[in-house]
C-alpha cells in the first residue's frame, strides 16, 4: 500500500454515495433488442441533458412495500427494495407500470390513468388491487459513481421487459423525449454528437449489444442474483481530454496508484521524451519501441 507521503497530489475524501436504482426497460424490435431511454432535464443537478434509463433515489417507502410485491425465491431483500424503487421511478417518470392484478393479468392503461404520479406510489397500487411485479426485475450491473464527481450514487442497473400495451409518457419535468433505441444505434448517435450519454450508460449499452433477444438478456441475469459486473470508474486526462476507465483496463491501475482517492489530476499520455512521475519515488519511463508485442512501447 502506498504511504500518503509518497503521493504527488493532496488527498481529499470523495463525496458520499446515495443509494439509487435505475432500470433498462427492454423490448424485442425488428432489428433486435431495444431499450427505453429519455432525456434528462437541462437543469438537472446530475448529468443535465443526458439520455438515460429511468431511475432515481431509493426511498424508505420502497423497503416498506415488500408485502405488496411478488418476488423470486432467490431474490434478496436488498434486490427487492431496488426493484420496487425502479418500478416506482418508471411510473413517476414515464407512466410505465410493472404490476399485476390478483388474477395475474398485467396493469392496463386504464389502471395507469387511475393513478397519480405525485401521490404515494405503493399505497395507491394497494388501494387499486395492484401487486408490484418485483419478480420480473433482474440485476444487470452495479455502478458506483466515479470518486472525482461531486454527486455520487451507488446504483444497480436493473432490467425488465416492457409491459405489453403500455406506452411511455414523460413527466416533462425530470424526463423528456422517451425513445426506443437499439444499443448499437444509441452508441453511434452518441459518437456522432447528437445523443449525449455518460460513461456508465455507454459501457452498459456496449455490453448489451451482443444480446439478440430480451429473453437472452433476462436469462443471463437470472442465472444468479449477482450483477454481471460491478464498477467504480477512475478518471484522468488523455490528450488533454477527460478519460474514464473500468477496473479491467490498464490505465485504471495507474490512476489508482497516483490518485487513490479518485481525483482527476493525473495525465495518462504515453510519451517517451521524459519520465512521467507516478509517485514521489516512482516514475514511468517509456521506451520508443512500438510493435505487435510491445504496443506503443515498453
Q: Across the structure, where does each feature detected by a protein language model lie?
A:
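N-terminal leader/linker segments that precede catalytic domains of diphosphate-processing enzymes
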Residues: 1-277
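Conserved beta-strand hairpin/beta-sheet module of binuclear metal-dependent hydrolase folds
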Residues: 275, 280-298
Amino acid at each position: 500500500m502506498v504511504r500518503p507521503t509518497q503521493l504527488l497530489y493532496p488527498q481529499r475524501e470523495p463525496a458520499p454515495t446515495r443509494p439509487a436504482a435505475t432500470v433498462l426497460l427492454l423490448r424485442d424490435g425488428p432489428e433486435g433488442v431495444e431499450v427505453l431511454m429519455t432525456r434528462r432535464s437541462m437543469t438537472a443537478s446530475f448529468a443535465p441533458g443526458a439520455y438515460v434509463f429511468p431511475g432515481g433515489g431509493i426511498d424508505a417507502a420502497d423497503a416498506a412495500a415488500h408485502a405488496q410485491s411478488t418476488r423470486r425465491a432467490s431474490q434478496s431483500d436488498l434486490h427487492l427494495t431496488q426493484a420496487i424503487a425502479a418500478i416506482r421511478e418508471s411510473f413517476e417518470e414515464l407512466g410505465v407500470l410493472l404490476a399485476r392484478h390478483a388474477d395475474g393479468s398485467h396493469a392496463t392503461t386504464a389502471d395507469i390513468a387511475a393513478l397519480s404520479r405525485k401521490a404515494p406510489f405503493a399505497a395507491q397500487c394497494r388501494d387499486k388491487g395492484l401487486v408490484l411485479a418485483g419478480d420480473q426485475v433482474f440485476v444487470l450491473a452495479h455502478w458506483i459513481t466515479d470518486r472525482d464527481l461531486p454527486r455520487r450514487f451507488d446504483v444497480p442497473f436493473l432490467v425488465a421487459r416492457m409491459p405489453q400495451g403500455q406506452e411511455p409518457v414523460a413527466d416533462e419535468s425530470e424526463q423528456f423525449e422517451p425513445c426506443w433505441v437499439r444499443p448499437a444505434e444509441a452508441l453511434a448517435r452518441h459518437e456522432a454528437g447528437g445523443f449525449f450519454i455518460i460513461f456508465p450508460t455507454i459501457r452498459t449499452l456496449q455490453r448489451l449489444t451482443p444480446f439478440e433477444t430480451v429473453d437472452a438478456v433476462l436469462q443471463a441475469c437470472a442465472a444468479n442474483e449477482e450483477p454481471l459486473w460491478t464498477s467504480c470508474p477512475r478518471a484522468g486526462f488523455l490528450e488533454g481530454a477527460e478519460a474514464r476507465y473500468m477496473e479491467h483496463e490498464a490505465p485504471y491501475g495507474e490512476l489508482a496508484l497516483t490518485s487513490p482517492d479518485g481525483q482527476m489530476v493525473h495525465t495518462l499520455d504515453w510519451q517517451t521524451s521524459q519520465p512521467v512521475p507516478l509517485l514521489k519515488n516512482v516514475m514511468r519511463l517509456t521506451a520508443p519501441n512500438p510493435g505487435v508485442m510491445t504496443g506503443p512501447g515498453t
